Structure formats: structure tokens, C-alpha cells
């Protein structure tokens, strides 16, 4: 399970092409939430990001598909997805690429679209996140 969470966190961080210090710092929070070793978790995620840089679109899609497969418990899937949404907005911005990757992850985790949208709207408003996505959640 730890490897799947690391891969998904790497995908979210990588999705907008920018790795912010806030995102890297949030990895420690995420590891703590999931009761995982913080330093190892962060190191592996950063290594995964380097692997993602080398992938084409099809490889990236398969990477997401593999990282989301086999997580049968809905509450665990939801908990992971909630943390990934927080990770996506931790730098104060939400763009098309992050929205798109979260949509793909939610689909593969079988998280309902309404859950994704409602919770993202809440997080965006609660944290005063700047939305630069065509899927402008701040207007919902």
C-alpha cells in the first residue's frame, strides 16, 4: 500500500510540472497520516518523480492505473484521495493539469465525481486557493 501512495503522490506533484517546497514538506504530513516512515516516504516519492519525467503519456496513464489498482477498501481509497487533493492545493494553486490528474485518479479509485468536485470546492474555498483551471471550482 505504501508504494501505491508514494506513486500517486509523485503523480500529483509531477502533474503541473512544478515541485514546490510546500508539496515536498506536505509529504511528511501525508506519511504521518498514513503511519509511514517520513524520511523514506519523501525519498521514494522524489525518486518516483524522477522516473515520471522519463515517461510518455501512455506510460504515465499505465503508471496511474497500476498505482490505483488493488485498493479494495473504499474508505482507504477515499482517505488516500483526500490527501492527494490536499497535496494538489498545498502550494495555493490549482491548475488544469492537477485537476485532470485528480480526475483520472478518482476515476481509477472509483471515487464518485460528485465527491471529488464537492470536496475540491470546499478545499479551494477553505484554503483560498487560486484556481487557474478551466474547470473553475471557485465558481461552483
How does the language model describe each region?
Residues 1-140:
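Small-residue-enriched hydrophobic alpha-helices in membranes
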Amino acid at each position: 500500500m505504501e508504494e501505491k501512495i508514494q506513486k500517486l503522490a509523485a503523480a500529483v506533484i509531477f502533474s503541473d510540472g512544478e515541485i514546490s517546497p510546500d508539496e515536498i514538506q506536505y509529504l511528511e504530513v501525508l506519511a504521518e497520516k498514513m503511519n509511514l516512515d517520513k524520511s523514506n516516504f519523501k525519498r521514494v516519492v522524489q525518486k518516483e518523480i524522477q522516473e515520471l519525467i522519463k515517461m510518455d503519456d501512455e506510460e504515465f496513464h499505465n503508471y496511474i492505473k497500476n498505482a490505483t489498482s488493488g485498493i479494495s477498501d473504499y474508505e482507504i481509497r477515499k482517505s488516500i484521495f483526500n490527501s492527494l487533493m490536499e497535496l494538489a492545493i498545498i502550494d495555493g494553486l490549482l491548475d488544469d493539469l492537477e485537476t485532470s490528474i485528480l480526475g483520472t485518479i478518482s476515476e481509477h479509485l472509483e471515487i464518485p465525481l460528485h465527491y471529488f468536485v464537492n470536496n475540491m470546492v470546499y478545499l479551494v474555498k477553505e484554503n483560498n486557493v487560486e484556481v487557474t483551471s478551466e474547470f473553475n471550482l471557485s465558481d461552483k
